């Protein structure tokens, strides 16, 4: 909103915003409802939402905030440089970032051998899980994937982590896990699991570690896409961008509550340490 206003689009003056939120199984219906509002552009979070919106709103420009996995491989763009069609946005390439988070977790706790991964149900996160399995094999770590698609499934998910004797947790890249970060961080703490998450604000809400792009920078880029489309540029002519800056955050308060000692290298490499 502030970035759109800075670029000349102010809600109530020359901009009308419609928002829809829901669990994964509700997304197609929400996308159809949104299309009935006749938007000029739709901002969609994650590949599955982009697919749903593309199907429900066949004539509307779409800005992905963000593609989780490769939009070219999934047939949503001809190339990153020139996507063609009506979809553009930010490609997170989450599979590489999720595998990197497993690396960071292992570097922080090098003796751990059993790691849980909190994931959505297939087909969500499949590319990330495949990349993480390859990383786990290289590290000599046993990976247990636990699936949950809504808050009511979190408690049983953490029970399964306990049953698997997990020693740490990777919360996979997903918008709903970001939304529920405080709930997940509390559950991880109750289970005695050091957790690494996606965004800085997830560490601020209680995850032990986070590693990912700088959200504020990405949102400015998403706003720039929206403005260019509203001013007449076809989305297919706007290159799909990938993040270029990443940050690592450590929550020492969470470390203290878990009773874990963080190695100096983890603290030295962190862009921010929450005391």
Model-derived segments and spans:
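Short hydrophobic alpha-helices and adjacent helix-cap/hinge residues
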Residues: 1-275
């Amino acid at each position: 909103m502030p970035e759109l206003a800075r670029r000349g689009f102010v809600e109530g003056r020359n901009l009308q915003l419609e928002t829809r939120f829901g669990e994964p199984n509700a997304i197609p219906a929400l996308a159809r409802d949104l299309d009935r509002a006749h938007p000029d552009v739709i901002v969609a979070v994650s590949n599955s939402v982009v697919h749903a919106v593309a199907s429900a709103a066949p004539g509307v420009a779409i800005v992905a905030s963000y593609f989780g996995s490769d939009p070219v491989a999934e047939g949503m763009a001809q190339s990153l440089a020139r996507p063609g069609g009506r979809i553009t946005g930010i490609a997170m390439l989450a599979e590489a970032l999720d595998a990197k988070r497993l690396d960071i977790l292992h570097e922080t706790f090098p003796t751990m051998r059993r790691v849980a991964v909190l994931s959505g149900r297939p087909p969500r996160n499949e590319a990330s899980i495949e990349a993480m399995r390859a990383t786990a094999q290289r590290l000599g770590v046993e990976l247990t994937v636990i699936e949950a698609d809504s808050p009511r499934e979190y408690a049983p998910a953490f029970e399964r982590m306990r049953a698997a004797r997990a020693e740490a947790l990777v919360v996979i890249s997903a918008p709903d896990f970001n939304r529920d970060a405080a709930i997940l961080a509390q559950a991880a703490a109750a289970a005695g699991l050091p957790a690494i998450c996606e965004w800085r604000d997830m560490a601020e809400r209680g995850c032990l570690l986070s590693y990912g792009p700088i959200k504020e920078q990405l949102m400015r880029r998403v706003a720039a896409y929206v403005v260019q489309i509203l001013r007449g540029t076809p989305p297919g002519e706007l290159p799909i961008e990938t993040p270029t800056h990443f940050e690592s955050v450590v929550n020492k308060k969470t470390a203290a509550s878990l009773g874990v000692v963080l190695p100096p290298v983890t603290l030295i490499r962190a862009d921010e340490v929450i005391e």
